[in-house]
Amino acid sequence: MNPPAYPREEQRRNIQGTTVLIVSIDASGGVLDVEVERSSGNRNLDREAVKAARRWRFNPEVRDGKKIASRVRVPVEFKLN
């Protein structure tokens, strides 16, 4: 999974935060939907987290030997050093 881009204005203003996403995954590991479960408190950080998550691939859940669709909670941290 590639991390999201850090918005330049938020970097400049030293804004950090964590966006918690709920990602719906199909049986092949593709992303069906992304929702913000808990905002970072910054719209631009949340937007970049969702944008990145839509490009990710996951290992789907396996139940009774079959890959199935599922949902996962993913925290996305934006932190400056």
Residue ranges of predicted features:
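Loop/turn elements at beta-strand to alpha-helix junctions within RNA-recognition modules
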Residues: 12, 27-28, 42-43
